[in-house]
Amino acid sequence: MENFLRKTAWLYLSIAVSVFLLDIITKNLAEKLFTTHVEVFPFLEFYLIYNKGVAFGLLSELPDPLRLPLLLITPVIALIITFLYALYSGDRIVAISMGLIGGGALGNLYDRLFLGMVRDFIHLHIGEYYWPAFNIADASISIGIALLILKYFFTKPALKNLVNRTR
């Protein structure tokens, strides 16, 4: 059991660190390369914007004394919860999901700590209908959540095992 916990922890950490590094590298490249609109496909553009809020720009209008502590504390809590959940779940898919979420949280936390806002540069759209801009960290968090939902949707005993382990 202890060996498996160690493997789960390493899986989580390796994915979280990989996502974090990929996110920071792509954001730094975006700052250098995407100062103007770059159309990759008719539905995909790259250009840099700065987001003071969270997903979809939510909370960006809050005053800094409220917004900044909230947006700095939340990812730290997410990192702790995702690591512990991955560690004690006893499941590789959960560890991968939590690593994606944790790495994404860390990438956006880095931006908030050092820039006061998050760098977004990926823009998807169909015609004039745009999805809000995002980055690798945001995509990683979304994929991690989707993977976790799919896992529990298709394997109900997994949730029962997790509850039994915590008792």
From Swiss-Prot:
EC category name: hydrolase
Annotated coiled-coil segments of the chain: none
An example of a GO molecular function for this protein is: aspartic-type endopeptidase activity
Could you list the residue ranges that cross the membrane? Answer: 9-29, 68-88, 98-118, 130-150
Q: Which reaction does it catalyse?
A: Release of signal peptides from bacterial membrane prolipoproteins. Hydrolyzes -Xaa-Yaa-Zaa-|-(S,diacylglyceryl)Cys-, in which Xaa is hydrophobic (preferably Leu), and Yaa (Ala or Ser) and Zaa (Gly or Ala) have small, neutral side chains
Which GO biological process entries does UniProt record here?
proteolysis
Report the active site residues: 120, 138
The protein's location, in the record's own words, is: Cell inner membrane
Membrane topology annotation: Multi-pass membrane protein
Keyword Membrane among record annotations: yes
Report the PROSITE patterns cross-referenced here. SPASE_II
> InterPro entries given for it?
Peptidase_A8
Q: What is its EC number?
A: 3.4.23.36
Example of a GO cellular component annotation carried by this entry: plasma membrane
Q: In which pathway does it act?
A: Protein modification; lipoprotein biosynthesis (signal peptide cleavage)
Q: Quick one: where is this thing mainly located? A: membrane
Q: Which UniProt keywords apply?
A: Aspartyl protease, Cell inner membrane, Cell membrane, Hydrolase, Membrane, Protease, Transmembrane, Transmembrane helix
Which NCBIfam families does its entry note? lspA, PRK14779.1
User: What HAMAP family does the annotation carry?
Assistant: LspA
| Role summary | This protein specifically catalyzes the removal of signal peptides from prolipoproteins.
Q: Which PANTHER family has this protein been placed in?
A: LIPOPROTEIN SIGNAL PEPTIDASE
Q: Member of which family?
A: Belongs to the peptidase A8 family.
Name used for this protein in its record: Lipoprotein signal peptidase
From the broadest rank down, the organism's phylogenetic lineage runs:
Bacteria, Pseudomonadati, Aquificota, Aquificia, Aquificales
